[in-house]
From Swiss-Prot:
Primary location class: membrane
Effect of residue 137 to H: In NDI1; fails to activate the adenylyl cyclase system
Name of the featured protein: Vasopressin V2 receptor
Residues the record marks as carrying a glycan: 22
Parts of the chain on the Cytoplasmic side: 64-77, 136-159, 221-271, 329-371
TM ranges: 39-63, 78-98, 114-135, 160-180, 201-220, 272-293, 309-328
Functional note: Receptor for arginine vasopressin. The activity of this receptor is mediated by G proteins which activate adenylate cyclase. Involved in renal water reabsorption.
């Protein structure tokens, strides 16, 4: 799925990454467990519908808001995150679903390479768009003047472009690793398989993907969220000017009412930080753990149903992404309620300009954290 075909050189196993093409093991046709195959198809179908529907709804809500000219910088990132997750649904889950249904890849060599390339682009883009969004929040809150000079309100901005560019570039090895290859000796049966020049190539490549798609973005997201929390917490701590006998050198300003608003914003930021990091890790960790296990352990339980099904959960994070960010953006959640009310024939609630999201550099710290 990730860095190999859905078929394997392991006998009888239809879903694990393929071994180098010089493996002496071969899997004959029609050896799949029918119950497990149906479970795989059902799981992929559910994931595809969930990813496509959830991201489509959030994109529709953003489009409605954009027609009224109410796009804020955070909406740009949420929109591109939804596009990246839709790419996961269309170019990763859907081809995988068709592949599972036919057991072998049905298509020419160019299509095999293109599918494998686009599968990886979606995975990179989904992770890197979250990282870009987090970096933008860090810049807006911790370096507001820098964010104001550069601006971030366009539909395409620098972090978005960098995220897409890295996704496209880092996926290029897929074009050279995968190809339509004979998988059953001289029988003429072909499949979209990976081939590595050295025996250690597969382990190295799987580890590299795990680091670049999961470990590095996780560390970056966690670090930025910690810095954001520290910045907001520092704004609430009375400075020397607010202590008895102190001089006016503190950072905290504003009325008690504003301080209460910032306190509520801090609580919301803490919740958002925990949700983002925990959900990101929980969604990606099972998939990459079994991928690394399969790559590094020759005795890995490749035939077990839990192992097989976990191999299919690379797109799980794409199901949760739109709802996490929509729930923490009052403007997007209000627009979603309005969209659903219109679909049911109800009168939508009015949406005021105060629902704007949070990452403009000119916003107050409270607004930056309470989107």
């Amino acid at each position: 799925m990730l860095m190999a075909s859905t078929t394997s050189a392991v006998p009888g196993h239809p879903s694990l990454p393929s071994l180098p093409s010089n493996s002496s093991q071969e899997r004959p046709l029609d050896t799949r467990d029918p119950l497990l195959a149906r479970a795989e198809l059902a799981l992929l179908s559910i994931v595809f519908v969930a990813v496509a529907l959830s991201n489509g709804l959030v994109l529709a809500a953003l489009a409605r808001r954009g027609r009224r000219g109410h796009w804020a910088p955070i909406h740009v990132f949420i929109g591109h995150l939804c596009l990246a997750d839709l790419a996961v649904a269309l170019f990763q889950v859907l081809p995988q679903l068709a592949w599972k249904a036919t057991d072998r890849f049905r298509g020419p060599d160019a299509l095999c390479r293109a599918v494998k390339y686009l599968q990886m682009v979606g995975m990179y883009a989904s992770s890197y768009m979250i990282l870009a969004m987090t970096l933008d929040r860090h810049r807006a809150i911790c370096r507001p003047m820098l964010a104001y000079r550069h601006g971030s309100g366009a539909h395409w901005n620098r972090p978005v472009l960098v995220a897409w560019a890295f996704s496209l570039l880092l996926s290029l090895p897929q074009l050279f690793i995968f190809a339509q290859r004979n998988v059953e000796g001289g029988s003429g049966v072909t499949d979209c398989w990976a081939c590595f020049a050295e025996p250690w190539g597969r382990r190295t490549y799987v580890t590299w993907i795990a680091l670049m798609v999961f470990v590095a973005p996780t560390l970056g997201i966690a670090a930025c969220q910690v810095l954001i929390f520290r910045e907001i917490h520092a704004s609430l701590v009375p400075g020397p000017s607010e202590r008895p006998g102190g001089r006016r050198r503190g950072r905290r300003t504003g009325s008690p009412g504003e301080g209460a608003h910032v306190s509520a914003a801090v609580a919301k930021t803490v919740r958002m930080t925990l949700v983002i990091v925990v959900v990101y890790v929980l969604c990606w960790a099972p998939f990459f753990l079994v991928q690394l296990w399969a790559a590094w352990d020759p005795e890995a339980p490749l035939e077990g149903a839990p192992f097989v099904l976990l191999m299919l959960l690379a797109s799980l994070n794409s199901c949760t992404n739109p709802w996490i960010y929509a729930s923490f953006s009052s403007s997007v959640s209000s627009e979603l309620r309005s969209l659903l009310c219109c679909a049911r024939g109800r009168t939508p609630p009015s949406l005021g300009p105060q629902d704007e999201s949070c990452t403009t550099a000119s916003s107050s710290l409270a607004k930056d954290t309470s989107s």
